[in-house]
Every structure is written in structure tokens, then in C-alpha cells.
């Protein structure tokens, strides 16, 4: 397993539509592991394959506090939503930035696991937001296109402690 470079906004791959995964090859299996390593190392809660330069419909998410409950979504599709939440949203492809985005508060997704077994998963709150955000990446959509108002700078906890 290895960390991969995260593509930053302005890289054209982030604006392209990803291709469906037909089978999990050893290359895709390695990509899944690398994406998890990359996401955890960067302190993110989600990562889509285009963010590491691969135009495949693959997303990894982990919103657990311990960072030990990864959700792997191959060819994910949102099949139902409910409610609404509005809050700050950031992205590993836009480091140091955030913006207010309105998303569904509940989302149900159908996808395939790393063994190409179909499943459905539901999420509320942060998990619902992560589902929407990461699946948008697969269609070349960045959260900045959905921001209410302006994107703003964010500081990390480390920077605040040093002041």
C-alpha cells in the first residue's frame, strides 16, 4: 500500500466523468488500498479516484472518529435522499478552503464492494454529505460549484494553537 498524490483544483482530471468499473483487477484492488492510505494520511473523511488521478467510479469514505470503519463504494449511485443540511464543506483537492454547501441530510447509496458484490448503504449527517461530495467527484463536480456564497480560508487546529 502506498500514498498517492492528491490532485488539486485546476487539474483537468477533476472535471471529467469517471468510467464504470467492470471488475476488480489487482490494479483496482491496489488502488483501493492506496486511496485508503492517502485519505487517512491526509486527514480526510472521503476520497474519490479522480482525486488521485484515476478516472474510475471508486470512492472510499470513513467518517468514524477512530478512522477504522472504511466504506468502499464501486460504481456508487444515490438512490434516495431526504431532508436537508447546510454546513461547511472542505475537500482534499482544495486544501485550506471551505464553503457552505446544502446537501441532503439522509442519503441511500447502491454500490459494489471490492468483491463486486452489490450492496446498499444509508447515511445521515456527515456520512450523507460525504456520499454526495465524493460521488459528485465521479461526475467531475467540485463542491465549489455548489457553495452558498464564497469559499473561505480555514486554519487547522495546529495553526490556531501556535498563535
From Swiss-Prot:
UniProt keyword terms in alphabetical order: Hydrolase, Iron, Metal-binding, Protein biosynthesis
Reaction catalysed by this enzyme: N-terminal N-formyl-L-methionyl-[peptide] + H2O = N-terminal L-methionyl-[peptide] + formate
Entry superkingdom: Bacteria
Keyword tRNA processing recorded: no
InterPro entries to which the protein is assigned, alphabetical: Peptide_deformylase, Peptide_deformylase_sf
One Gene Ontology term of the molecular function aspect: metal ion binding
Gene3D superfamilies: Peptide deformylase
Annotated Fe cation binding sites: 91, 133, 137
Cofactor note: Binds 1 Fe(2+) ion.
SUPFAM superfamilies documented for this protein: Peptide deformylase
PANTHER family on file: PEPTIDE DEFORMYLASE
Function per UniProt: Removes the formyl group from the N-terminal Met of newly synthesized proteins. Requires at least a dipeptide for an efficient rate of reaction. N-terminal L-methionine is a prerequisite for activity but the enzyme has broad specificity at other positions.
Name by which UniProt lists this protein: Peptide deformylase
Organism for this UniProt entry: Lachnoclostridium phytofermentans (strain ATCC 700394 / DSM 18823 / ISDg) (Clostridium phytofermentans)
Lineage of the organism: Bacteria, Bacillati, Bacillota, Clostridia, Lachnospirales
Record gene name: def
Amino acid at each position: 500500500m502506498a500514498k498517492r498524490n492528491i490532485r488539486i483544483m485546476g487539474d483537468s482530471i477533476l472535471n471529467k466523468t469517471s468510467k464504470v468499473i467492470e471488475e476488480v483487477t489487482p490494479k483496482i484492488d491496489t488502488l483501493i488500498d492506496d486511496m485508503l492510505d492517502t485519505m487517512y494520511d491526509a486527514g480526510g473523511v472521503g476520497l474519490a479516484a479522480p482525486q488521485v488521478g484515476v478516472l474510475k467510479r471508486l470512492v472510499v469514505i470513513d467518517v468514524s472518529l477512530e478512522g477504522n470503519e472504511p466504506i468502499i463504494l464501486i460504481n456508487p449511485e444515490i438512490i434516495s435522499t431526504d431532508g436537508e443540511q447546510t454546513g461547511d464543506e472542505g475537500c482534499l483537492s482544495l486544501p485550506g478552503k471551505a464553503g457552505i454547501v446544502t446537501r441532503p441530510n439522509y442519503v441511500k447509496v447502491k454500490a459494489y464492494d471490492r468483491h463486486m458484490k452489490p450492496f446498499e448503504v444509508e447515511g445521515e449527517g456527515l456520512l450523507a454529505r460525504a456520499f454526495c461530495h465524493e460521488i459528485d467527484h465521479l461526475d467531475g463536480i467540485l463542491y465549489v460549484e455548489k457553495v452558498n456564497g464564497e469559499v473561505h480560508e480555514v486554519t487547522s487546529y495546529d495553526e490556531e494553537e501556535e498563535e
